[in-house]
């Protein structure tokens, strides 16, 4: 009681694409929330902003992960596995890739989203130093939030 369940779509699972998210949402009760993962949805060819707008009443958690489109195209051209794509640097922190985070943050503000926003990178720590990228991601989401007029609460501040 009092616990909100949410499904996390993810590459390598039964729900990866926008169409599969649609099927999940259409065939489950409204009480099941959705964790929107911007990087994984973009990797699967989806649009995180359109998905947020479509399911904003059921999204209870957001993973903010950016994608490097050129690395993704190279991985697709070479038929690399998902894991090899990750190791080649397909993902990064928000603002260091090609997802339109300003538009997403405007949509979050307009929907009065109040759930968690969690920065993820899924990068090789030997190449992308975690502390450097954690700071970069934090600074970038602060910048996008300010430009979008979205007030963020930092849990440790």
What is each model feature region?
Residues 23-27, 107, 140, 144:
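A generic secondary-structure signal
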Residues 1-4, 28-33, 58-60, 111-115, ...:
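Short, well-ordered coil/turn segments that N-cap beta-strands
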Residues 18, 22, 42-114, 128-132:
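Gly/Pro-rich active-site loop or hairpin
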Residues 128-153:
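C-terminal helical cap(s) of enzyme catalytic domains, especially alpha/beta-barrels
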Residues 5, 37, 62, 108, ...:
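Conserved, mostly hydrophobic/aromatic
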Residues 1, 51, 100, 104, ...:
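Alpha-helical packing segments of well-folded alpha/beta enzyme cores
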Residues 1-33:
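Active-site acidic/histidine proton-transfer and metal-coordination neighborhood
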Residues 10-12, 37-41, 65-67, 91, ...:
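Active-site beta-loop-alpha junctions enriched in small/polar residues
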